[in-house]
UniProtKB/Swiss-Prot annotation:
CDD domains xrefs: AKR_AKR9A3_9B1-4
Stated role: Aldo-keto reductase; part of the gene cluster that mediates the biosynthesis of calidodehydroaustin, a fungal meroterpenoid. The first step of the pathway is the synthesis of 3,5-dimethylorsellinic acid by the polyketide synthase ausA. 3,5-dimethylorsellinic acid is then prenylated by the polyprenyl transferase ausN. Further epoxidation by the FAD-dependent monooxygenase ausM and cyclization by the probable terpene cyclase ausL lead to the formation of protoaustinoid A.
Gene3D superfamilies: NADP-dependent oxidoreductase domain
Location of the active site: Y81
GO MF annotation terms: oxidoreductase activity
Enzyme class: oxidoreductase
BP GO annotations: terpenoid biosynthetic process
Official protein name in the record: Aldo-keto reductase ausK
Binding, substrate: H156
Binding site for NADP(+): 76, 186-187, 212, 241-251, 317-325
Similarity comment: Belongs to the aldo/keto reductase family. Aldo/keto reductase 2 subfamily.
Amino acid sequence: MTGTQILELFGPAPEPPSELGRYRILSPTAGIRVSPLQLGALSIGDAWSADLGSMDKDSAMALLDAYAASGGNFIDTANAYQNEQSETWIGEWMANRNNRDQMVIATKFGPDYRAHELGKGLAVNYSGNHKRSLHMSVRDSLRKLQTSWIDILYLHTWDYTTSVPELMDALHHLVQRGEVLYLGICNTPAWVVSAANTYAQQQGKTQFSVYQGRWNPLRRELERDILPMARHFGMAITVYDALGSGKFQSRKMLARRKDQGEGLRAIYGRQQTAQEEAMSNALGVVAAQHGIESVTAVALAYLLAKAPYVFPIIGGRKIQHLHDNIQALSLRLTHEEIKYLESVGDFDLGFPYDMVGVDPADTGMATPIVAQAAPMAFVQRSKAIGYSESNKGLSE
């Protein structure tokens, strides 16, 4: 074997087509390698076009192709999205491209996903956190996705109707069977996730390795209890609504949409609030400081700076928006820029943090009760990728 052949065999891989292909470990408890931005498939389909805009199958396939061509491998969907079209079209795309092994697919169970065909009230056990709902949902997701395994399965929404042991035992059984590799949970109070992971650890079951929740510069409630909980249990955080339901838009972009006859399509309302407009303007200021126009790239960069193991979900329907958002991976926001963005909102950690303070591992500073006793120095936890001690992008 020649030196060139040895280098080709054991040398490093070539640089990726974009930073989307510079993969990251999902979490301390899940070693799978994923793209730093996850493609959200909520809009892949045309069944919900009245609320989310239309996307025919050709456009969906083109978007998936563009994401993969840029190095992306991490796709987020759910059993109910677009009345089951989302999973179905993704399955067709992977089958046609013969790329299932290259993709990391996350899907979800919990909400009623069959009423669109069976009728309201006639699909009662197709929803819920219980074992029967889980069994049928995974069976159907595997069929629609045309695969024999799901990389990450989320509980979509906690509904308070199923015990922690029933849920975790049933999920662990799927992992043992090889139908699911990693477990995630969405839209659930921190105390429930803590109880579930504690049960799993004590019983030798599979714990949740990733949490999915709503987070952006204006909606920071996740930082209060969920972010510390995720750190404690070694969980990643995948983020939806990272772009303010599509309402973080510059004046230029809004004018362009108006000229093209497009409004704001958003689940949480179709008009910018005064605060969303103010945040859009602030994002634009930071974007200009970095020599770009994309306010959405700055919104994503903000989340990527906040903590390690954070993976924003990027949705939308246009390939140009995908490329704009990939710019976020090359941005490094300063501490001052992050504080400037956060000053637009009115988030407050509240009790008990306003009394006991926050973890010195995050701030490097003693809490009031500790400072009262003696001067102290603290080891700080790891920063987000790209953020060193001298360029602190983490919240302080």
